[in-house]
A protein has these predicted regions:
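Gly/Pro/Ser/Thr-rich low-complexity, intrinsically disordered segments predominantly at protein N-termini
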Residues: 1-170
Length: 170
């Protein structure tokens, strides 16, 4: 299957792609995601366990990648209409009405991305702006290299860095 064509891609196309490949769609353009490193997976597993335990018995649920988040999908959209689909490392969704068999329709309440060398620019710039535009209320960027967690919250439609935690503070 050729991955590049002149037209924009949609969720309908993505649903036909090899499920073993990590591919995101950003405004109709496919973005190949590199396989994560061991440390990346260890951090995600630790965060997943903490969030799962914290949210137990609450209405919010945490979902690890692969989990298709269609940030701008509306209720009446067909797969052919959806041109943006990301697979955050962790997503917290508090509205069960946003969930379907594929993943999440609309913005999750919290997205966490753990940086890898190959995704650092993508997560800090492209996804930061994308999540802000989609109205994701809270976005955490975890940097294993810097040993930091940047917590940004949406205020008047723009992200503001609320906290920058270091390994010593955690």
């Amino acid at each position: 299957m050729p991955l590049l064509k002149e037209d924009r891609y949609t969720l309908a196309d993505a649903l036909t792609w090899d499920k073993r490949e990590r591919i995101e769609l950003i405004d109709g353009a496919p973005v190949m995601m590199a396989p994560p490193f061991r440390l990346h997976q260890e951090i995600i597993t630790a965060l997943l366990a903490q969030l799962y335990n914290y949210l137990e018995g609450k209405k919010c649920k945490v979902y690890p990648a692969p989990f298709a988040v269609r940030l701008f999908e509306r209720a009446d959209d067909r797969p052919e209409d959806v041109d943006t689909m990301v697979g955050p490392d962790l997503s917290v969704v508090c509205d069960p009405g946003k969930l379907d068999d594929i993943g999440c329709k609309g913005a999750p309440d919290l997205i966490i991305e753990v940086l890898s060398p190959s995704t650092q620019c993508h997560d800090r710039l492209t996804k930061y702006n994308l999540y802000e535009r989609a109205g994701v209320p809270e976005y955490w960027i975890v940097s294993p290299e810097e040993r930091t967690v940047q917590v940004s919250t949406l205020v008047d439609g723009r992200y503001r860095v609320q906290e920058l935690y270091t390994a010593e503070a955690v």
